[in-house]
């Protein structure tokens, strides 16, 4: 909307994103930070002297918690080398490594790399969405199998949407084929994705 700006500046560390009590603590910390951010904008940013908070997210966003171990684990090298996996289910992915500090504010020393250079777009393999030891389950979004650094790349919304589309089609295909998700005919999933314009 004209006159409104989305600000994404709150940050909390040393919180277990799987513990509801600690998440509640993080909510309080972030809400206190919002007041400080508004004051900062009013004092130091021209044009924001009379700014005020219009709305905030209902819940704190958790960037990273535990990682599943999948049949395939995505690595930073897969991303930089623009790997096209034979069992791809999400394509045309490109983003930098956006590693936030786990000990304080800002980015990790390896954070948002301004000199990031990948050879091109990479794909998400179906194997990263299939847990190594759990049957009847598919992973989608930021919880797929990948290293900490790779996760900082594929956890963003655009890539997660593509993963969700591929995994959703795979789940429906597993039901139609009457098989466990790990035994899905990935070529059939890819045919359905290609039918709606998703290509490697």
Label the predicted regions.
Residues 1-200:
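Flavin (FAD/FMN)-binding glycine-rich loop and adjacent Rossmann-like elements that form
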